[in-house]
């Protein structure tokens, strides 16, 4: 199961998507801006961040997975837990977790998780005409 696709889908509509037992992906709206030197215009966008301290299951992701994958809520929670175990194992062994269209989580020298957002997707639907 590609859980990152489900997270990505939800980031268009919600400010916070919690992956139970792992952490939460948060979005913050950034205003449009123009660069002076190149006269380039950048539309408003949502910037994604990650908080490893928010781990409680709010049901949002599991409900979405259950509906989209046509499975029970309970099975969705189990499948998400399996993915969380895989990601945690990778990070504990100093590997990176790459989440397509969301970002990359790695471990620094102090064994803290570091999130680098992907800049390939604008989750702010108001930016599109």
Language-model-detected regions and their locations in the chain:
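Cytosolic/nucleoplasmic/matrix-facing N-terminal domains/tails
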Residues: 1-129
């Amino acid at each position: 199961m590609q859980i990152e696709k489900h997270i990505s889908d939800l980031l268009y509509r919600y400010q916070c998507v919690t992956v139970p037992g792992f952490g939460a992906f948060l979005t913050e709206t950034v205003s449009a801006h123009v660069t002076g030197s190149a006269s380039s215009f950048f539309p408003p966008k949502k910037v994604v961040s990650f908080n490893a301290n928010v781990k409680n299951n709010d049901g949002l992701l599991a409900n979405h997975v259950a509906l989209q994958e046509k499975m029970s809520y309970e099975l969705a929670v189990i499948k998400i837990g399996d993915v969380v175990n895989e990601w945690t194992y990778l990070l504990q062994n100093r590997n990176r977790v790459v989440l397509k269209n969301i970002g990359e989580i790695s471990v620094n020298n102090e064994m803290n998780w570091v999130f680098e957002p992907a800049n390939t997707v604008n989750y702010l639907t108001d930016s599109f005409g």
